[in-house]
């Protein structure tokens, strides 16, 4: 009797992760299932039986909000994903709600951009665009193109849920710092998903059937910076001789939570500012399907 194996494998990249935020990046890499995950919140309450009146924005940092309570005490809420970005000498709310935007120039893509953040991300409205992802920050930009015989698919966007209530839970969970874009079956039995969390984005390649190989290539165009491949498979984005961001090494997970770092990464310079990134996941591990 023939049995059909039902499984998926995920090859994941944490893209454009700020070097200074290695701990959040490590935590993200341990989230083995694809999709949006909730903010983890820890709170420190200095009073009992009180409710939130307002936020004291002067006490903000990247991960923390402080709330004034009805009894005059304070509540500090710390989040696992950045909720603020720094601009013009103040911490502002991150809003990663994705909204439609047409191409601004001849080389731009039509897609969806995050509303307010220290980093601008734009995701293609469909696989027909010249790139799946564009990132702009601090005087440089990076675009990310899947080089393959792609199927024609539209982007599936998941935005943060609106919190319209005034309860303490609504206020504490009202951040809009996580969203996602998925290209379902952009390759045969393969999805590509981008999860935007704070100022970082994670790419999941979800493989839903066994393949002859697990090799994926991306053309990366960089303006105002350069890419440097490290021995551990990570890639530094270097500007003015300094590493400003990094793309950590790819890894694999499956539906059962198994993990493997057996992924080969190559980076070839095609021309000035244009690179070909190729990742090849271990075939034996990839074909070891779970029932």
Q: How would you describe each model-predicted region?
A:
Residues 1-4:
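N-terminal hydrophobic targeting signals that begin at the initiator methionine
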Residues 6-20:
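Sec-dependent N-terminal signal peptides
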Residues 6-7, 23, 163-164:
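Intrinsic disorder/low-complexity segments enriched in polar/small residues
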Residues 8-12, 27, 33:
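Sequence-pattern detector for short linear motifs
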Residues 19-28:
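C-terminal segment of classical bacterial N-terminal signal peptides
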Residues 30-291:
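Residues that cap or anchor secondary-structure elements
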């Amino acid at each position: 009797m023939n049995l059909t194996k039902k499984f998926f494998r995920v090859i994941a990249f944490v893209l454009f992760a700020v070097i200074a935020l290695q701990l959040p990046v490590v935590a993200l890499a341990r989230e083995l299932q694809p999709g949006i995950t909730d903010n983890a919140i820890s709170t420190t309450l200095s009073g009992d039986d009180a409710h939130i009146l307002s936020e004291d924005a002067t006490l903000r940092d990247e991960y923390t909000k402080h709330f004034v309570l009805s009894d005059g005490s304070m509540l500090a809420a710390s989040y696992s994903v950045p909720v603020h970005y720094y601009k013009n000498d103040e911490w502002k709310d991150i809003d990663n709600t994705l909204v439609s935007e047409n191409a601004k120039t001849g080389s731009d893509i039509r897609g969806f951009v995050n509303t307010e953040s220290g980093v601008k991300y734009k995701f293609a409205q469909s696989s027909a665009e010249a790139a799946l992802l564009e990132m702009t920050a601090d005087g440089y930009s990076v675009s990310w193109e899947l080089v393959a015989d792609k199927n024609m698919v539209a982007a599936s966007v998941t935005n943060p849920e609106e919190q319209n209530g005034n309860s303490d839970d609504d206020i504490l969970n009202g951040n809009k710092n996580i969203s996602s874009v998925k290209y379902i079956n952009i390759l045969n039995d393969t999805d590509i998903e981008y999860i935007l969390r704070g100022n970082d984005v994670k790419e999941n390649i979800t493989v839903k059937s066994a393949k002859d190989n697990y090799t994926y290539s991306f053309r990366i165009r960089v303006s105002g910076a350069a890419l440097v491949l490290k021995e551990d498979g990570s890639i530094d984005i270097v500007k003015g001789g300094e590493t400003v961001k990094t793309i950590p090494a790819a890894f694999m997970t499956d539906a059962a939570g198994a993990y493997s770092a057996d992924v080969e990464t190559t980076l070839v310079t095609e021309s000035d500012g244009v690179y070909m990134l190729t990742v090849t996941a271990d075939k034996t591990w990839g074909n070891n399907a779970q029932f």
